[in-house]
């Protein structure tokens, strides 16, 4: 589907992925519009459509609601990265909890000081108040 899920396409997701592999793109952001924002987990069926020999990195998105969803997505060899907005925007200290859990599971993440993140939260909260 395209056009926000309103227009059904005549080709499958797998066919579309093969077409993407032929053009100069760096990665594929594979988002489930059915799961996006639900927090119910990634749509695992989408992963089944990714060819085993697919040459581009896949970023799986749409549906993460807890750090376990990241782990489930990243444990699949066809997935190179995961994404979320819902989890970080609406659920307390999810960024810190998720990063700690993923690092404990042995996933390779950029290392940065969580105190800096906290200070940035304060900065952006202050900036929002100033703009009101």
What do the PLM-derived regions correspond to, one by one?
Residues 7-14, 40-48:
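Charged helix-capping and loop-helix junction motifs
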Residues 71-113:
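C-terminal helical cap(s) of enzyme catalytic domains, especially alpha/beta-barrels
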